[in-house]
Structures are given as structure tokens and as C-alpha cells.
Amino acid sequence: MCGIVLPSIQQQSSHGDTRILKVVVNGGVPIELGASDSANFSFSITAEDPSGIRSVDQIGLWSNNYGILVPSATSCQAVSRTTSVCTGTSSVSIPKHQIFDDMAGHWFVQATANANDGDKRTEDEAGKFSVLKMSRLTVFGGPTQTVARGQSISISGLLEKPDWRTQTMVGNPSQNVSLQFCANGCAKPVTVATVRSDSGGNLLATVRASSSGTYTWVYPGSFWASSVSSFPTPVTVGS
């Protein structure tokens, strides 16, 4: 059975020793959407009862701000006498207006597991997953010529996020972004500056050039936006 189920109106009628053990959506990784993307994804629900699992139904994929996605019916496969894994699919489309800006972030899976002996377990938050805005980060402004050791250089950049209403990319303001430096041959970059994006998503850091290498902007993401790194920009330091 499939359909749209709202936690606020779903009858809570669990009884017996049926349990929902695990829920995995999109292979356990966030669903990331750009300005006008659509995505198909799968989900699996593992349930257990001493008598075995007959079905998992009443699936609801929901978020705050009335976010709802429509799931398929599930298909269950017994992995032991007591436990079954039930799988299904769903999709989300920005052009079809299935998700809006205030729905980015945390989502939940509601499900009812039905046992062979008539027991069942219903959970509004049987599992959780994330639908994120796909960030974009561009580096600008590195010096194009050789600079002297110890010279101050400025590296600029732009952090953007999708606006799902207009289906365009816009600046992402008030976000902490790190500038990392990797000297030629380095095994691990080091953070040389952390700045906050301005109202238009613009970034600017001034550092002293110590050796030749590359500078990269790194955004750690948030609960509603994906992490992202810019392409590295090279800087050559003379003797």
C-alpha cells in the first residue's frame, strides 16, 4: 500500500512485539538538488517480529512546513525467519513544485510494519534523511604573476545556493567559509583564513604568501545546504 500519510492524522495503533529496526534512504547519503533538478531515490525499511513480517505500508515521507513526497508501494524480502527488508522508491522534482525553499534540510520516514501474527508497529519518525540545496563555490582573484615571499595577496570567491522558487542560483549570505592552502607537494591543506560571506555571497581574504601552492575555498555546509569546495587556484612565490 502506498500513498501520502500525514503524521498529524495517522492513527497511532501499535501493538505486540513488532519492531522497525532500520531505515535507509538514498543509500544513506543526502539527496542534493540544484536550482532546477529532479531526483529519483530508493528507501529500505528493515522490520522484525517473532512470527515474521507480512508487509510494511502506510509509508510517509515528510518534513516540517508541510513537505510531503509520494512513495511507491514496498516489496518485502525475508532475510531470516523473523526479519524482512522492504524496499520502495520515490522522487522529488523542483520544476514540478514538489519541494520549496523552506523544506530543505531534515526529512522523516513514517511507516507501519505488519507481522504475520497480526501485531504491528507504527512510527512517525521511523527514519530520517536529508534533502539539501546543492551549494556552488567559485574562487576568483588570485595573483596571476609570481609574488614575493611574505607579500600580501587577496583571494576572493563566491558562495551560491539554489533558489528553488525562481530556479536560479543566488548568493548565500552570512556563511562561514574557510580558505585553505596546500603548498606544492603537501599531503594535507591547512586553513589560513576563515571569513563570512557578505549579503551577496561574496568572499574575500588577505593572506601572506609563504610558498608556492594552491588556495581553495571550503564551505562545510549546513543542515539545509551541501558542503562544497572551489577549484584550487595556484599561486607562485619567488625567492
Predicted feature descriptions by range:
Residues S84-G88, T191-V207, G213:
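Glycine-centered loop-to-beta-strand initiation motif
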